[in-house]
Amino acid sequence: MRRWRMEKFKIILSDPPIVKNQRQRSSFPSFGVLYLSAYIKKKVDNIEIYYLESFLTLDGHINRIRKIQPHVYGISFASFLKEKSLITIKKVREEFETLKIIAGGAHPTIFPGECLNIGADFCVLGEGEETFAELLNTIFLNKKDYRDIPGIAYKGSDGEIVITQKRKLIENLDTLPFPDWDLCQEKKYTGHSISKGKPQWSIIVSRGCPFNCNFCSNPIWKHNIPWLRLRSPENIAEEVKLIYSKGYREIDLICDEFNPNLKWAKDVCQAIKNLRLRDIFFRTLLRAAPIDEELCSLLNDINCWSVNLGIESANKRVLKGINKSITIDEVTRCLTYLKKYKIRTFGFFMMFNAWEKNGQPQFETLEEVNNTLSFAESLLKKKLLRNISWGFVSPIPGSDLYNTLIKHKLIHK
């Protein structure tokens, strides 16, 4: 695109302000925002991008906007931050009447009307990079017709909400630039409380999930195929090398699960191993299946010392009901491999699951919950798990569980 204007347009990308005082800190920045910023800088000319991080108070957030005086303000959030985020949008609209407000992320994708009715001008639905960049170019050209931009919601001239056609998912993640390192205040993030290497950073290695657990909100992204997109092992290794050169010594490989494709997971490990970086550590998230001893050996080779494993339940009926697509035998086999290679495993369990069968709601019994807790305790005693976490299942908007409970009037929207 040719450079058609002299004035630089200022854009704010923000996390919801979630702290009560400025002394609080977050573990990591929003890597989605950093990837988005890098893409926008590649596709939109003559701009300045600012990042308002989550460790600001609401007043601090507003003061930063007032100081920057942006042309566009973007905020991204999931449903568990809905309340703080909607309050923020409302406050920003009240303080800055002419500012263009764009909401993105999981919650605006599911409930764009909530955001538009409280003050947002647009919602970006689904993946943000291509849509946000196209919307910015349209805004900066002062065009008033947004109907041809896929993947947005806005209010038309009659006040009715307009939702444009869905945008295709980005198939080749290698085409996306690496995160915008200059955007965030790296030293203000605490990282994980337990680690083997410091400082810490993260890489998003894939997008999407081929599985369909009923408690997950992943269906909101599955409006198109391919659902699962994997960065090439070479591309991941290149970013690892860059992060290492900046002094980081532990990397979290972020994904829904690292092993949806066993060959790819092994190839990623091998590509990292070929870098011969001896003093760096990794952590990631696995499924109990598919897995084999070779993958666990390769994880050990690259100093992957910690993995999270979603087990959820010890009951066959429940695992089938929530569509987890694993068995207890697979869980035990996976943990046995990980223990052999001295990889610390954190197991996650959910209590009082629910699902639908033959048109009727089904519920996990107290006996089944106790069986799961007993199973978790046995895994700790055998040192197959190092830590466990459990909690009540929560119906996340966009999940099949949420839709089932709404359908049977067991919760309200």
What are these regions (language model features)?
Residues 2, 6-12, 17-20, 149, ...:
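N-terminal [4Fe-4S]-dependent radical SAM core
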Residues 9-10, 39-169, 398:
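Glycine-rich beta-alpha loop elements in corrinoid/cobalamin-binding modules
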Residues 20-23, 112, 157, 263, ...:
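Flexible glycine/acidic-rich beta-alpha junction loops that bind and position SAM and/or redox cofactors
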Residues 20-33:
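Glycine- and acidic-residue-enriched helix-capping/strand-helix junction motifs
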Residues 28, 174, 179-345, 353-355, ...:
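Radical SAM [4Fe-4S] cluster-binding motif and immediate context
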Residues 36, 61-64, 84, 88-92, ...:
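A general structural detector for well-ordered alpha-helical segments in enzyme core domains, enriched
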Residues 112-117, 294-295, 356-378:
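Catalytic cores of alpha/beta
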